[in-house]
Amino acid sequence: MIQQESYLSVADNSGAKRIQCIRVLGTNRRYAHVGDVIVAAVKDAMPNMGVKKSDVVKAVVVRTKATLRRDTGNSIRFDDNAAVIINADNNPKGTRVFGPVARELRERNFTKIVSLAPEVI
């Protein structure tokens, strides 16, 4: 579960390495899970890229360390908390996505992120 001030790694090549959650988007939401959109501040970034340190960005959570329970009874858990930075049209800013992403992103209409990901779990 991601909440305010949680740190996440960035799973794309937009230029940011780590982001800190500022707010979970939605009506009075406290926690974010896989597929939720957050507002975050860039805490660590690579030089000469599209995103700079201290930029405020929107991102979608693609992996969480908290257990994700599916309707089939399966549960899945990732090794890290990760997000992909998105623009206003919910398309990723980067051109590549690193690491596996959860299948729930397809249900939330983030099909571009799912198509860029090397593995969908």
Curated annotation (Swiss-Prot):
Protein's GO biological process: translation
Gene3D superfamilies for the chain: Ribosomal protein L14
Top-rank taxon, per record: Bacteria
Pfam families: Ribosomal_L14
Keywords: Ribonucleoprotein, Ribosomal protein, RNA-binding, rRNA-binding
GO molecular-function term, one example from the UniProt record: large ribosomal subunit rRNA binding
Record SMART domains: Ribosomal_L14 (SM01374)
GO cellular component labels: cytosolic large ribosomal subunit
Subunit-level organization: Part of the 50S ribosomal subunit. Forms a cluster with proteins L3 and L19. In the 70S ribosome, L14 and L19 interact and together make contacts with the 16S rRNA in bridges B5 and B8.
Described function: Binds to 23S rRNA. Forms part of two intersubunit bridges in the 70S ribosome.
PANTHER family in the cross-refs: 50S/60S RIBOSOMAL PROTEIN L14/L23, LARGE RIBOSOMAL SUBUNIT PROTEIN UL14M
NCBIfam families assigned to the protein according to its UniProt record, in alphabetical order: rplN_bact
Similarity comment: Belongs to the universal ribosomal protein uL14 family.
Family annotation (HAMAP family): Ribosomal_uL14 (MF_01367)
Name of the protein this chain belongs to: Large ribosomal subunit protein uL14
Protein's organism: Parasynechococcus marenigrum (strain WH8102)
Gene: rplN
